[in-house]
């Protein structure tokens, strides 16, 4: 059952109303009651059937104002790339010792970047990393020889997103403490990329719903007209 604060917050939102994005941002800020700096999330309902490979929507986007979160990064590479990764700001850098650590159950990072020449060995831990969304992937730019660029992008606010089985995409787009304009810019950048990635196999209306919420807050529906494609 929802807590008292959540129920009180929900009364401040018109349930059947779609808010303009700027209004929705202010509403989420108003109803967030957490003592910590809550993350703002966007949820997008898409008219796709992710059971079909040609309707899977996945991608990355650079949020202009970052996520507000300190992202911890592990780079798995051979010695020749290790210094480059460290200088770019990677929190952990290594090769076989980290594969062993992961096999033993360690997954204490937000993002893993790997060079192509270690992907064979990384396959040993794919079953551990895959379900946690940590397996490096060339499509998301986390399998690359340019480890410095990849580390800097992730640290600066590059996020990865993927449609789930129900046809929804969720993404963190900043913190409640962010300036409203900065949140707006981040959200628009994310939504534009989702729209750009519309699969040609998708039938009917592509964007079917957009909602904004923060950690432990009710969600606020957003008007879709500017983002329907």
Swiss-Prot record:
Keyword DNA damage: no
GO cellular component: large ribosomal subunit
This protein's record includes keyword Ribonucleoprotein: yes
A molecular-function term among this protein's GO annotations: rRNA binding
BP-aspect Gene Ontology terms: regulation of translation; translation
InterPro entries: Ribosom_uL1_bac-type, Ribosomal_uL1, Ribosomal_uL1-like, Ribosomal_uL1/biogenesis, Ribosomal_uL1_3-a/b-sand, Ribosomal_uL1_CS
Keywords, sorted A to Z: Repressor, Ribonucleoprotein, Ribosomal protein, RNA-binding, rRNA-binding, Translation regulation, tRNA-binding
Pfam families: Ribosomal_L1
Function text: Binds directly to 23S rRNA. The L1 stalk is quite mobile in the ribosome, and is involved in E site tRNA release.
Subunit field text: Part of the 50S ribosomal subunit.
Database matches in PANTHER family: 54S RIBOSOMAL PROTEIN L1, MITOCHONDRIAL, LARGE RIBOSOMAL SUBUNIT PROTEIN UL1M
Annotated family: Belongs to the universal ribosomal protein uL1 family.
Name by which UniProt lists this protein: Large ribosomal subunit protein uL1
Species assigned in the record: Chlorobium chlorochromatii (strain CaD3)
Encoding gene (name): rplA
